[in-house]
């Protein structure tokens, strides 16, 4: 089975910078990484997956070592995740993809300005193994602490990372392989 990393987050949250950082720095040099963008957000992406009428259409693995699937940033995350689960059939013996990690990218200013977005993130974090905090420097530190508090208080089993102003993560391999404390 080919490992699949799923990226969640709204359009403009920093998903592209996170994907770039992971693709360039999370795996040993020479690994072939395939990027799967949702067809309507894909732009010039050579590969695409499609979410349509409640169904996910995901291409079969090729010769890549790992694939990164980016969900559509403007569509309902639960619907996409349920459709992906039905399509990928991770528990079935004939599954061709193995969901290795689910990563949410948080846009701090957007979440701070809109309570509904902050609640939307709670759904995403529920699914996630890792959370990348983006644009943290644009909001008060107290807001970030308050945002993270429920996850820390409830001992959410996911890792939290900061995406810096230059689009870097301190330890990219830990995002894909790290274990929560």
Model regions and ranges:
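Well-ordered beta-strand positions
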Residues: 101, 129-130
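Charged helix-capping and loop-helix junction motifs
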Residues: 116-121
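Glycine-rich P-loop/Walker A and Walker A-like loops and their local beta1-loop-alpha1 context
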Residues: 1-46, 70, 78
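Conserved Switch II/interswitch segment of TRAFAC-class P-loop GTPases
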Residues: 65-66, 70-86, 95-115, 136-142
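C-terminal accessory "lid"/substrate-recognition subdomains
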Residues: 139-181
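Short, charged/polar "capping" segments at the starts of alpha-helices
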Residues: 14-15, 40-47, 77, 112, ...
